[in-house]
Amino acid sequence: PCYCTSEQFDALRDKGQFKALCQAHGIPTARRYSYQEAQCLPESAYPLAVKPLDGSGSRGFSKVANPGDLDAAVAQARSFSFAGDVVIEDFIEGDAVIIHYTAHQGSIVYSGIADKCSQKMGDAGAPIMALQIAPSRDEQKYLDELNDKAIALFKDMGITEGPLWIEAFNRNGSFLFNEMGFRFGGSLTYYLVREMYGIDQLAALYACATGGNAGELIARPAAGAYAIWPLHLKPGV
């Protein structure tokens, strides 16, 4: 058995589709432009963010400071896209957060939020996660403003199983969704979810794969904090 459908996976991997879903559910995102629209923008509208439509790991991402750099950034982003397409949008100045949810047996439960710092590795490297600290300093504001809308989005997509995470920007306490993963993250974040919120995402996915039931999902926030600090030894490690 598989915890997701190909339609769900494609909609969440495709940054354009994901942001359209967010907007339909009243969740803010960065303003997006077509290539033709971007060509007509005044320099005062810059910087822009240019990225592959369906890429990952910040590969092919560029912060474009002026109109003269747009074409090169688009070409680079397209080279990293499976679909050969790109996203052009406002560059958001703000801190990043990672928001976690867990789905099991049709129940979808908020499972934490962490403040995220990124660092560029080497001159030619892409920015990658350098530190996460949970809970986020603005956790309650997120819960008050967007938690219900995010859960409604997942339910409207028919999601019933699996780990979910969202990268969002926190701009002075206002959140803008950026992208989403319908899978485990690459930083063993299911440990964070288990230790800080009492939800075992790995056990829930094992149960789904074997036809079992991991029981009712109940978030039990713990006191204290949890940090993820990856040590990058060399490129690729």
What are these regions (language model features)?
Residues R31-R32, P47-Q76, V86, E93-H100, ...:
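Glycine-rich phosphate-binding loop of ATP-grasp-fold ATP-dependent ligases
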Residues L231-V237:
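Glycine-rich active-site loop/lid that clamps phosphate-bearing ligands
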Residues A38-A45:
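Short amphipathic alpha-helix with an adjacent loop that forms part of the alpha/beta core around
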Residues P1-R13, G26-S34:
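A short, GP-enriched loop/loop-strand-helix hinge that lies immediately N-terminal to
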Residues D90-V97, Y101-I159, P163, N170, ...:
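ATP-dependent carboxylate/phosphate-activation module, predominantly the ATP-grasp catalytic core
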Residues P1-E7, A24, G211-G215, L233:
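ATP-binding N-terminal substructure of ATP-dependent carboxylate-amine bond-forming enzymes
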Residues L21-P28, D69, S79-F80:
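Basic phosphate/pyrophosphate-binding loop/patch that engages nucleotide-derived ligands
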Residues F18-Q23, I88:
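Structural element of the ATP-grasp superfamily
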